[in-house]
Amino acid sequence: MGKTANSPGSGARPDPVRSFNRWKKKHSHRQNKKKQLRKQLKKPEWQVERESISRLMQNYEKINVNEITRFSDFPLSKKTLKGLQEAQYRLVTEIQKQTIGLALQGKDVLGAAKTGSGKTLAFLVPVLEALYRLQWTSTDGLGVLIISPTRELAYQTFEVLRKVGKNHDFSAGLIIGGKDLKHEAERINNINILVCTPGRLLQHMDETVSFHATDLQMLVLDEADRILDMGFADTMNAVIENLPKKRQTLLFSATQTKSVKDLARLSLKNPEYVWVHEKAKYSTPATLEQNYIVCELQQKISVLYSFLRSHLKKKSIVFFSSCKEVQYLYRVFCRLRPGVSILALHGRQQQMRRMEVYNEFVRKRAAVLFATDIAARGLDFPAVNWVLQFDCPEDANTYIHRAGRTARYKEDGEALLILLPSEKAMVQQLLQKKVPVKEIKINPEKLIDVQKKLESILAQDQDLKERAQRCFVSYVRSVYLMKDKEVFDVSKLPIPEYALSLGLAVAPRVRFLQKMQKQPTKELVRSQADKVIEPRAPSLTNDEVEEFRAYFNEKMSILQKGGKRLEGTEHRQDNDTGNEEQEEEEDDEEEMEEKLAKAKGSQAPSLPNTSEAQKIKEVPTQFLDRDEEEEDADFLKVKRHNVFGLDLKDEKTLQKKEPSKSSIKKKMTKVAEAKKVMKRNFKVNKKITFTDEGELVQQWPQMQKSAIKDAEEDDDTGGINLHKAKERLQEEDKFDKEEYRKKIKAKHREKRLKEREARREANKRQAKAKDEEEAFLDWSDDDDDDDDGFDPSTLPDPDKYRSSEDSDSEDMENKISDTKKKQGMKKRSNSEVEDVGPTSHNRKKARWDTLEPLDTGLSLAEDEELVLHLLRSQS
């Protein structure tokens, strides 16, 4: 076999393309083998993620708080760090530095720090990392529960969570009041992180069947001291009962609770207490300047208006104690127009309106927000310059949270507290809480009085006047219900002056205030009576009894002049009835003591003249004079010690056996009372109106009177007898049907009369028109030569045609009368007049087209004149 041309022995060069293709094929085969080997050696993503999680968990114990300055110094997942960087969170605060590491290790944490120190991120970062470690998905259900006291704070927390955790695959939801419950119930099962308020959460636990929290991993209470307060106590107890005990719990607040009872409710296990600023000099931010002023209650509105006028380019929050105050003052200040935008935020607003106000105040650079304490906790409003506390807070903790809305995270801010002269004790409480407040004075030259303007506004607007009255009552009630009576004393408030400052002419009536004012006098009377009635010895002589009687009469007359009423009077107020019953029980006890003492053979020391007392008791009270009755009551009200040590249980049982007067009286039902009033035949006032023509205008339809007299009018039994009512209705139905038949007959008769009258009128009109009807024919202008008019001598002899026209004229008259009746007195046309001629008796069968016309040799006008002449001659 010979050698080829491309063989090496032939001396020819090898083909480079062929050799390159051969090399490329070998190289690609080698690379594919390497890729397959690399794929076999490569781990799946879930396994790599688990290994990274295990490495992070190993680094949790190595966290050194002193070395941490950034979030990247913590062993956090890449998704969390990326979310923090995108949200511009890089440096950590003190509370974040000390609590995030403990929370990552799975410990229960109680964190407390100043307002604006970053507590929200301190619990959101551990929340994201806890679910990331467990590889939590939407199908796993609820994993973390974050509870906030207010809707606005929950909304703010949810927005921060969206920014920080947007790179994770968790689902988060906001459950607050004011939203659609069904819409929330449809999506609540797929939520991993739930931010909510206590009330709506409990509602879903009770009403949403598929909602459960059995797999809950972490519970977070934001503003924990407020949530664990008495206001949320019942709700939180019910919520905690539905949560598993094996969970991690985080509590954060600016004023943290240390109550063992509250912490025991949450089932905390070895919690870590983190009080960042516990050893600090002040409990408020160092950049916050705090002052207070003292002014009278009637000057507070003028002070507020003057403050707003002098801070037009500032962003301020004004706190009030009640919603109705915010509602009234917001509307009034909008009418006063201080020169700055005013917003209102309170609990009585709809949820969507509250969100709009919150977002609008965040956007504005210069505005004033009138708010209640729902905005006092947790809300982070940017660049707030002033916090003005119009009403004194209930305690120092509330003041700290209110003032914390400004000076957020190393920014400057100012806080002003307005106190009444009776509320100066609050300053000492603030100093005890390490709150540095200084007193400043009001410049009277810059104070603008707005009382006259308010009076004029209320005089024009009735709705605003009613709001002012509700504002007045609401403020007085809030002061009255405050727990700290050393600071809040409603009796020291200048009530009439405060009403005038609101623009009201007269102070509204406050019922609870009137009752409160009566209580001191009763206590004084009771104390004086106790002092007077104290016995001097266990046994008394007759002379001593007489002296005591005169002394009692004198004292009781003085007390009665001061407002005390006698025992015999009825229908007292609630507080008076309690005192009266107590005094009557004491009298009965004394009488029982005397009877028991007689039974034992000993004489009662309180009544030496028992025969006289017995005679007095036997006389009916209605026959006694007023003086004797008072004297008897005064004497029997002598309070004695239980000398014999008798048991009072027997006395109370005897008192219970005696029937009271109220139980003896027969109860009067509403039906009996109504019948009793009807029997008296009271004449009710009636308003009678007339039209311009003098006709009576009936405002109400007449009441249908029963045709059957009720046989049991005097029956006082309550309720309705259905059987008798059914029989009564059946009898009434017969009369109703008869009345209906009469009405229908009268209606038909009236209709017939109207139709008959109409026919008569029509006949009269027809007869009148027939009498007045007259035909006018124009003269012909054909003969121009005859200027003198028509010549009667040219007419033919009328006697020639008289005999033949006698019968036809009668038929013609009948036809004309019939056509007039049918066509409404319409004039005949010229064609009908032309067709008049000798015809047969049967006009219907006659054929008009076969008849030959009568040729008189005259013109048309002359023929018409002839016909008219003939008709007149017949008549």
UniProtKB/Swiss-Prot annotation:
Comp. bias regions, Acidic residues: 577-593, 772-790
In this chain, where does the modification Phosphothreonine occur? Answer: 4, 577
Where is the protein found, in the record's own terms? Cytoplasm; Nucleus; Nucleus, Nucleolus
Annotated region Disordered: the residues are: 1-43, 562-631, 703-850
Q: Where is the Helicase ATP-binding domain?
A: 100-274
Q: Looking at the keywords, is Signal present?
A: no
Q: What is its EC number?
A: 3.6.4.13
Report the protein name in the record. Probable ATP-dependent RNA helicase DDX10
Which organism is this protein's natural source?
Homo sapiens (Human)
